[in-house]
């Protein structure tokens, strides 16, 4: 489909459940593939990125089978088989970076990792360099900075490493490698990042110590598979919450959504902007808090965002920009250097699309300044990025918008546009 046209939408009304959390699905599949025996991943995300993870793990000898909405995984007991072909990670940066950690200590195993054009442009040196310091043998384009990447499993030694910039993916890759290393592997973060890997280590009984911003692990022995329930993805829920906030008369409740505090920085910022939001944690699944969030239309005001919150909402910056476009006054969002190297250059993509909708925006090397007050109808480009496609469907919803190449939303949210239209129709 060339473009998806959303007519101006009246109030959004209703309740919904969003697909399973992408981060938890990736990590859950990987750990089940490492485990001994059989385990189920209930209500995972089944979309472009996570299906790439399933295919890669199958190529490494794990049995991954779909059972209705679930995955059944029979693990390899810490030892993967050497793949017969190149491992294609598609568009999934999380998969490629975590896989480097997973394979680095598989002694004697050889694998080549590649991905689509977008993934082959993304920086991998931030993972490769500390893995090499552990003894990993990894090579690739630009001295290992870009895929394709070749990995030859080797004996690893523990490492004490301080992340130069906050990155849950680098932290997770090193923790996974640490399961195969001699001695302790310790990662220190400059600021907290999402902690799904740590929670899943506890779920599976893997070695883990957390002390402030330091996380430690060490070599593990075989461990049994355990079933895992995946919560709804807060990053997917965020689009509907902001859609309700900016569309007059709206009230939307997202149920069964993950409310991990290392993921919900957006709620803090939206509340500071004057958003009418309520949420409650009802239960926990595999150490992950789960609950509901209600959003009602609100008259938002611009704010200066605390840069310390950005690692807790790094995937929600595009939809925060959508809220800022409708807010009264100026919103300043700093600390965005990581967004330059996501699926797209998200800082540039946000700025260009906001301008296309008549919003005044300034773009710096690692910041955005958005002068809100509303948008005009227009046509927006996803830049091959799922979160840009969905965020700009939301920002244009009250006035009407055309989204080019809407299929990019399928990377993380199959059925996104159908769910959006259903809530519009419910009013």
From Swiss-Prot:
Question: Cellular location of this protein?
Answer: Cytoplasm
Question: Which UniProt keywords are given for this protein, alphabetically ordered?
Answer: Amino-acid biosynthesis, Aromatic amino acid biosynthesis, Cytoplasm, Transferase
The source's superkingdom equals Bacteria
| Biological pathway | Metabolic intermediate biosynthesis; chorismate biosynthesis; chorismate from D-erythrose 4-phosphate and phosphoenolpyruvate: step 6/7
Asked whether the keyword Nucleotidyltransferase is assigned, the reply is: no
- The EC code for this enzyme is 2.5.1.19
Gene Ontology terms, cellular component aspect?
Answer: cytoplasm
Entry annotated with the keyword Disulfide bond: no
GO terms for MF: 3-phosphoshikimate 1-carboxyvinyltransferase activity
Main role? Catalyzes the transfer of the enolpyruvyl moiety of phosphoenolpyruvate (PEP) to the 5-hydroxyl of shikimate-3-phosphate (S3P) to produce enolpyruvyl shikimate-3-phosphate and inorganic phosphate.
User: So what family is this one in?
Assistant: Belongs to the EPSP synthase family.
**Name by which UniProt lists this protein:** 3-phosphoshikimate 1-carboxyvinyltransferase
Q: What organism is this sequence from?
A: Thermus thermophilus (strain ATCC BAA-163 / DSM 7039 / HB27)
What gene is this protein a product of? aroA
